[in-house]
Amino acid sequence: DASAGNMIWMSLMHAIDAGTLAGDDTSHTGYVILMAVVTICGIFVTSILIGIISSGFEEKLNSLRKGFSRVIENNHTVIIGFNDSIYTIITELIEANSNHRNGRILVIGSEDKEIMDEEIRNHIDDFKTTKVICRSGNQVHSAVLDMSSVETARSIIINEEDDFVVIKTILSVVSYLKSKNAFENKAYITAIIHDSGNLEAARIAGEGKAEIIYFKDMIARVIANTCRQPGMSSVLTEIFGFAGDEFYFEEFPELKGKKFGDILNLFRVSTVVGICRGDDPMLNPPMDTVIEEGDRIIHLAEDDGVSKPSEEQPVIKADGKKAVDKYIEDNEFELLILGHNDSLPLILNELDDFMTKGSKVTVACDSLPENADTACSGYSNLDMSWIEKN
């Protein structure tokens, strides 16, 4: 049968399977030669086709392996920037998500995805209910932000060490959220600034949507308060770490119309410390403050959602110990500070706010700074002096 359809079919079979040639009728020399040529061409075409397909699959797998694929997530936490502090941040977020199923953390860094995955696994043993996803790319590019589903994130943490990069990233994220009409969504941006001169620029870039933390000022306040109170660091770690109890802002509609003093004992497994009205937190407000619609209760609890107010006031026995009403004034305090850096003025300003007048602060350092004379003045409660010693 020498019909066109049959010849096309036979040519296709010879191109796909070289073994078909062995079953051909060898009485027609021209036919055999033609089919042999078709078979040889088919071998080359098939080899090229297999190579193209394999190369395409390999390229796609490499793209997925290197973290260039789109992340389809919702209500996740995005961390922009990969450095040594990433492990502490992820550990705290894992603890925060421990009472939630399917927690997601997305890390965007300039390193390869494989390197970030390996480093995170080496530093963190138990991920509990949280899955950590890494993506590689330049965070100031909208394509990388789009790949990371930033517009559907619950929170965005900018974890960069350079203030200039932080500000650029804030601008990029804000611009991207606006382009997606998601700027007014619940996602909140948090960033750390190391130089006070960049604070205002970072706040302007965030357009009221970013919480800018001045790192040196925060650490200086912690140091100033913990140096006089043994155990204060443990208290701060307990409050601000997600292990144990922490502060939560929750709305309880059933408390509307009640006075703040009346709700203090309604929570059995948490401690009420204040009210948040709009964006203004009020710690320890007057006892006759009335809870309004939309007010959120600030309370110290083990986890969010575990504490609910009871309907009836519990019976309180008044035969226990009472707080001392008399104010006990602190005595003059002497403090030795070893070393000097840019954080010293911040620490001294914080100490000057609450130390008793006449308290003495001595700073010992290898070499006196140029402004040592002026640095000793300007404090209301501190008598400051310098010692130049190793």
Predicted feature locations:
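Cytosolic regulatory regions of ion transport systems
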Residues: 1-390
